[in-house]
Amino acid sequence: MKISAILTVALSMALLSNAAPLEKRRFGQEHSAFVEPLYQKMRDSAQGTNFAGQVGQMSGEAVNALLAAKPACRQQVVADHLVFFAKKMGADTTIADGKTREKDLINIAKQYRTAERNTNQDGKPSFLCGRKPSFKELNGIVQKQDPAATTKPDTPTDATNLDETFDPL
């Protein structure tokens, strides 16, 4: 009985040690050295204003939007929301440095929009968003791609789903 248990454990360990993933995956882009400071800058840009909670929530959603399983337009939607809140801060006369904060947050949104997204496979490009941004400041900006990608990025047919349209609520 003891020998069969020992053999079972030994065989299981041997099999597990030889197991390897079928595909190398490219994860971790949502916490890269490029984007991590942007999340803090997002929060800092609205600190002390009536928009701190909303922009803080967007900084959390910004992390989520870079995940491989998220829809192709989620990153652009977050950037659109950041520009929306930036313009609101710039127009708010109770914020002494509102125009400066507006400019700063728009620049942060532009930088964020260029951030590389995770992909389900190393060397595979992430999907592009198939709709125009809601604000002209983001026109022509798309996310960076995996430098090891050997194909061009696709635009999925579901990139314009209603749940991915800009809605500032």
Predicted regions and their residues:
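Fungal secretory targeting signals
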Residues: 1-27
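Mature extracellular/secreted ectodomains of secretory-pathway proteins
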Residues: 24-169
